[in-house]
């Protein structure tokens, strides 16, 4: 039985380790619950990501627009918005607000990893946008996690 671990502001974390949720099971769970956004930390705790305010959404949209424009101009990589989930080497499953990776790393992934499941890779560049309800320490730890798992640059 999964148990609630804690509530931090409006962020809920559930300990689902007893369920032994595989990467595929997590993918299927997310696909079956598309009205919600989830992440999973390296400890195997399920995190429910709440919707943001329209102001935060607008800032996130602008960041993704700028990153997309740079990506099209630079032509060395691929960019992703917050619906793109990555399985980090630590086992954490994260969906940064915006991210980018070199084309070579993108195309080194199998078609299945790019199209039919969450990609088992850490992006080269990640952006996490802090909203008023976000805990700064938790976001800093999340950014540290990206760097420890191979991100070369992170913006918070």
Model regions and ranges:
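Gly/Pro/Ser/Thr-rich low-complexity, intrinsically disordered segments predominantly at protein N-termini
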Residues: 1-156
């Amino acid at each position: 039985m999964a148990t609630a671990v804690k509530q931090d502001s409006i962020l809920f974390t559930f300990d689902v380790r007893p369920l032994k949720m595989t990467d595929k099971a997590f993918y299927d769970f997310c696909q079956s619950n598309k009205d919600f956004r989830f992440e999973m930390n390296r400890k195997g705790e399920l995190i429910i990501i709440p919707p943001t305010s329209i102001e935060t959404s607008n800032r996130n949209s602008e960041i993704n627009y700028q990153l997309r424009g740079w990506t099209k101009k630079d032509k060395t990589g691929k960019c992703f918005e917050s619906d793109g989930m990555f399985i980090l080497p630590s086992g954490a499953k994260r969906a940064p607000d915006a991210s980018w990776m070199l084309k070579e790393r993108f195309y080194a992934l199998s078609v299945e990893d790019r199209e039919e499941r969450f990609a088992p890779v850490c992006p080269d560049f990640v952006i996490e946008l802090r909203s008023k309800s976000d805990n700064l320490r938790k976001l800093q730890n999340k950014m540290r996690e990206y760097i420890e798992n191979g991100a070369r640059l992170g913006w918070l």
